[in-house]
Amino acid sequence: MTTAKKQVWLTRDRSFYRTLAALALPISLQNLITFAVGFADNLMVSQLGDAAVSGVYMGNQIQTFLQLLMTGVVQTTGILAAQYWGKRDMTSIKQIVCLSMRAGLALGLITMLAALIFPSQLIGLLTPDTEVIAEGTIYLTIVAWSFLFYTVSQIIIAAMRSVENARVGMNISLIALVVNISLNYILIFGWLGVPAMGIRGAAIATLISRVVECAAAIVYARWIDKKMNLRLRDFFGRVNRLLAGDFLRYGAPIMAGEIVWAINTVTQSGILGHFSKEVISASSIAGNMHNLVYIWVRGLASAVSVITGKTVGSGDVERVKEYARTTQIFFIGVGIFTCSFILGIRGLFVTFFAVSDAARAYAAQFLVVMAISMLGTCYQMPCLSGLVKAGGDTSFVFKNDTIHVFCVVLPSALIASHLGAHPAVVFACLKCDQILKCIVAVIKVNRYKWIRNLTR
């Protein structure tokens, strides 16, 4: 009679924890640096007046649209490349990077041309304010030239991350941060003999920092990296048709999921935008807190994604299951810590913003809702994206998000708003999916049907 093997909920494989830390730390630092770049931009441009701030914000919405599309390409690259990395199949990884680069350049080129040809029309879709449109057009027509450079650097960073080289992204982002902040100060306000350029200076600083970021990524990939050893000819060679089909098949639902999330984000802003300016300010403050805490959650989830893809690609199903159980326990702990962190500093955090007392009161209420919702986010997001999606079931997250967004989140928030509910109640409706998805995640993850080897 054989004895059933006891399930292990916390793996004793020390390499899991070492790899998790080695990947999560630089990815989280890269996210923090990216956050710092945006924060520095907002801080400096805010001194130019409301129209300039609004113009930059609206201009950046076009760039955000490209970033969402690129997230789909980058995630597809990471999932497929990580699984082939588990097999140490560098030939297939290079072909995946080639496909990603072509897709990224196509998206970047289309978005760039649209922004250059129809800048005021695109800004006009977002706001009727003529002064904001004028400022946004100035900014967008300069920043648009950076879109191609951005796509190249993001694909290279994603490729390096998939083969467990996450530090390169952090280092490249740090270079971009230094360049961006330095040039912002020099060009916006005029320094070292350079005339003050205002919003044009902010746009030029962003463009130059993107060029430097792209150049650093290319130099690293071509002359420093020893794992992939990329060459220019790798991007122009013939690609296996079956691999190209896999890229489209598994990438399409990921891209669709990003589009759904973009619609969700814009609509949520519109719902809260119908309340008073104090509520809108409170929502902005809560958004800053979300971005801050999401840095480490996303970094850890990205690390789990690489580990999962590599282990699935190696064919060790039992180890994947063991890692999945450990991941669930670990991120429950992360959720408790994150919730406690938000609740602990919310009173101090709202005082950093020069807003009315009413806005601070709303913000404090929103942060309580956010703290509770982050309990769910910290569990379901790493489980569904870091395990299920990276493990091979790339379409499930798209279907799950679509159902929750269009059948639960937006309808409940719209109804609550229409009935005159308190803003905090509406905000809770907008965040309720983060808790509800935990039920789905528990069932989906522990059935293990998501473990699919996508390699050939």
What spans do the regions from the language model cover?
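Helix-terminus/linker motif at the lipid-water interface of multi-pass membrane proteins
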Residues: 32, 36-54, 123-130, 186-197, ...
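N-terminal transmembrane alpha-helices
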Residues: 11-43, 47-48, 61-76, 80, ...
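Short runs within selected transmembrane alpha-helices of multi-pass transporters and secretion channels
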Residues: 74, 143-162, 169-177, 202-218, ...
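Small-residue hotspots at the loop-to-helix junctions and early N-terminal turns
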Residues: 50-61, 136, 140, 203, ...
